[in-house]
Amino acid sequence: MLLRTASSFSLLKANADHILPLPNSSSSGIIRYSQSLGKNLVPCATKDTNNRPLTGVVFEPFEEVKKELDLVPTVPQASLARQKYTDDCEATINEQINVEYNVSYVYHAMFAYFDRDNVALKGLAKFFKESSEEEREHAEKLMEYQNKRGGKVKLQSIVMPLSEFDHEEKGDALYAMELALSLEKLTNEKLLNLHSVASKNNDVQLADFIESEFLGEQVEAIKKISEYVAQLRRVGKGHGVWHFDQMLLHEEGVAA
């Protein structure tokens, strides 16, 4: 769309219709003046006789898109959606997917332990099962984002977790919860590293994704499990563990 100069104002003359260009102006406006009203000039609107377009086109889509068309891959194996997505960011996301799956696997092992008939701490079993599912959802969310940006998901091996969580001094509940707190802090470090990689590669979209989907939630999880650890340290290994377990059993949304 072309912009044209607005119509200029002019001054009327009653008995004569002299037309002069605007003084000290490069515009094409005119001045009409009159003496019928004394020496005062009466301003009025008049149409410019020379409607010249302004220069400076903001956006020329068909010209600018030419360079983008050259970037669209023609090889069948190449992603069509990929744009400003570095190999470094792609690899780090695959590493984070592996972290989330490994943590999920450990939590699932904890769920299986506390669900045993000779342990029977159903609240802790519920907590770690929900935590395992949440970490798996995190991994899947990262996989979806990887595909969205045109990267390739490469799943890596998962380490076999422990099957026994009883501790001679701390007991099983406190030991497992302290382990969970360590895992959440480790996951947070990995997420911060992923955010750092995104920033170094000027990938604002990846940085925003990590900030909005993971970092805030991770802080909340660390706070919640820290409180659980503090409470279990107070109750020791005795009857208080059962009361703590009942609290988790009847609490909604207890997963980290």
Curated annotation (Swiss-Prot):
Keywords for the protein's UniProt record, in alphabetical order: Chloroplast, Iron, Iron storage, Metal-binding, Oxidoreductase, Plastid, Transit peptide
Binding site for Fe cation 2: 135, 184, 218
SUPFAM superfamilies from the UniProt entry: Ferritin-like
InterPro entries membership: Ferritin, Ferritin-like, Ferritin-like_diiron, Ferritin-like_SF, Ferritin_CS, Ferritin_DPS_dom
Catalytic activity: 4 Fe(2+) + O2 + 4 H(+) = 4 Fe(3+) + 2 H2O
Domain of life: Eukaryota
This protein's GO CC annotations: chloroplast; cytoplasm
Entry EC number(s): 1.16.3.1
Residues annotated as transit peptide in the record: 1-49
Iron among keywords: yes
Subunit structure: Oligomer of 24 subunits. There are two types of subunits: L (light) chain and H (heavy) chain. The major chain can be light or heavy, depending on the species and tissue type. The functional molecule forms a roughly spherical shell with a diameter of 12 nm and contains a central cavity into which the insoluble mineral iron core is deposited.
Functional note: Stores iron in a soluble, non-toxic, readily available form. Important for iron homeostasis. Has ferroxidase activity. Iron is taken up in the ferrous form and deposited as ferric hydroxides after oxidation.
Similarity section: Belongs to the ferritin family.
Protein name (database record): Ferritin-3, chloroplastic
Species of origin: Glycine max (Soybean)
Lineage of the species this protein comes from: Eukaryota, Viridiplantae, Streptophyta, Embryophyta, Tracheophyta
